Design a protein with these regions (language model features):
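Short helix-capping/linker turns of helical repeat alpha-solenoids
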Residues: 10, 15-18, 31-33, 38, ...
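Hydrophobic face of amphipathic alpha-helices that form TPR/SEL1-like repeat modules
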Residues: 24-31, 35, 60-67, 96-103, ...
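Alpha-helical tetratricopeptide repeat
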Residues: 4, 8, 21, 59, ...
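Short hydrophobic transmembrane-like helices used for membrane targeting/insertion
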Residues: 8, 18-20, 25, 55, ...
């Protein structure tokens, strides 16, 4: 394994106009693989490849413009390249293009178009787009509100490990949104998100333990999860943890803490 030689030969091929090599050497400069990191050189090579239709380079060039990395930040230019990659079927770009439509970044805000592009990426199995599409259905954004479809897309994303989707699927089970209420399933999905560090899920899991919902009541475990959430700044968890300390539930009583 010799990153320097890999980069050297890649650059030679790039200089001869090979698009895939231009994309690869751009990535080398972007990440410092085998060369000294230089984001402006990354942009130079991504552009060369993107102009030849290389879909990966089009997406990465869009990201450079979006974040102002190696070039001036320019949302309109970012959208131009996201669109090109999205139209070639790149799921990353389709999701990002949808996001730009949802928030009106570099393009006029259009929730229906956001849904259209999220759906294209989601149907390719792109996890974050599945979550985004679920959120659109849950809130009636760009599409008729449909809790059952929201639950369906949250589940797809949750099963791929998206913490926000796992949390929302837990909420669906807790309230019977689009699915039969099931406290054990609620806890299962909160736990998955909580173990990934998602603060709202940590709070809700603590609540389930404190109230014996879907699990055996256990104030010590409730306090453990409330603390994790509180340490991330969740105000509700901070207040509830204070109450647990004040009353000695699951923790040694400590009115000062």
């Amino acid at each position: 394994k010799d990153p320097k030689k890999a980069a050297m030969w890649c650059e030679k091929a790039a200089e001869q106009g090979i698009a895939v090599a231009q994309n690869s050497i751009g990535y080398c400069y972007d990440t410092g693989f085998g060369v000294e990191k230089d984001t402006s050189k990354a942009v130079f090579w991504y552009r060369k490849a993107a102009e030849q239709g290389n879909v990966g380079a089009q997406y990465k060039l869009g990201k450079c413009y979006y974040y102002g990395k190696g070039t001036e930040k320019d949302n309109e230019e970012a959208v131009k390249w996201f669109r090109k990659a999205a139209e070639q079927g790149d799921a990353d770009a389709q999701n990002r293009f949808g996001y730009c439509y949802e928030y009106g970044e570099g393009v006029a805000k259009d929730l229906a178009k956001a849904v259209e592009w999220y759906r294209k990426a989601a149907e390719q199995g792109y996890d974050v787009a599945q979550y985004n599409l679920g959120t659109c259905y849950a809130n009636g954004m760009g599409v008729a509100k449909d809790i059952a479809k929201a639950e369906e897309w949250f589940r797809k994303a949750a099963e791929q490990g998206v913490d926000m989707a796992q949390y929302n699927l837990g909420v669906c089970y807790g309230h019977g949104y689009g699915v039969a209420q099931n406290r054990a399933e609620e806890v299962k999905w909160y736990r998955k998100a909580a173990e990934q560090g998602y603060a709202d899920a940590q709070h809700n899991l603590g609540y389930c333990y404190a109230n014996g919902m879907g699990v055996t009541k256990d104030y010590a475990k409730a306090a453990e999860w409330y603390r994790k959430s509180a340490e991330q700044g969740c105000a509700e968890a901070q207040y509830t943890l204070a109450e647990l300390y004040a009353n000695g539930y699951g923790v040694a009583q400590n009115k000062e803490e």
